[in-house]
């Protein structure tokens, strides 16, 4: 179960499709239940997999639960994995049903969901229940694991994201114009991502590196404020707002970049649990500048694959960007290290970790097999 892949192909939605592809490739039958803001239930086949769109509305909860139960019983599904929504009412009820019917269940947390659950009056209970009910609990980083309110029944599994490693070979770094200095931002345009801090630092950088360009990829509620800030700073055509990009166009932007910068902040209810964009940039040999917050230090190794600065310190951000753009050798060294490290993060390996938290093991043929059937449980 996840959020609706048709509503975006980044983040959690992209994970859902990557895991589905890996599981199907291994001969495992998969069906995806996608919660969306719509009110109607519909069914389609997406990349060869049955995808059922269900409403996340509270008022549609009985119908959503009925549809989920039908999916599980008609197809004799023996495992349920909540890729997102583990602490929601729908997620908790499905975990209860899975436990009653002796189906394996697992849930994955990202950091932001754990912090936001604390805002609700019933937040502590909604966090405790999935940890008690699920057979396996995963987190997207060691940092996110540290946010769990208590240790679940089985040790939590770290499930890092993967990258599409084959794509990078289509965009060789050797073909890039080294004289062009392109700084890249990829992310939702929300306060926590810190695009405003990047614009401010970039405005100062332009005074010393007038040929530098900034590409901002993403969409969100802060777009109008960011456009106004760019205009106020007089950045003109040195900044390009591309909107949300996916697929080949996004890969082309990565391949053209000199440096990825994501100056994330942390608030009481939101955090960067890991930062898949750092791995995506690394896949193209692009080093990163990030902040020492949340799980970012697990994605960017300071001095090895990029640089880390303190959150909201535009002077540190400016210094890090300038020092790297002024030193092509260092930029190349960090980029090579970033690529080497990113290539270790495959979706196949990430899928192995998902199956591990669900209690599967490898058999002699190299496939993942469930050592305990429902009858044995």
Please annotate each region the language model reported.
Residues 143, 162:
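Carbohydrate-associated surface elements
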Residues 302-303, 307-314, 322-329, 343:
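Conserved acidic donor-binding segment of nucleotide-sugar-dependent glycosyltransferases
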Residues 278, 283, 287-290, 300:
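Short hydrophobic beta-strand element within catalytic cores of glycosyltransferases
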Residues 4-5, 88-89, 103-121, 136:
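A short, histidine- and acid-enriched strand-loop-helix "catalytic/donor-clamping" loop
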Residues 238, 255-270, 286:
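Acidic donor-binding loop of glycosyltransferase active sites
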Residues 175-193, 199-202, 206, 260:
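Conserved donor-binding/catalytic core segment of Leloir-type glycosyltransferases
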Residues 79-101:
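An aromatic- and histidine-rich active-site surface loop
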Residues 227-248, 259:
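Nucleotide-activated donor-binding/catalytic signature segment of Leloir-type glycosyltransferases, i.e.
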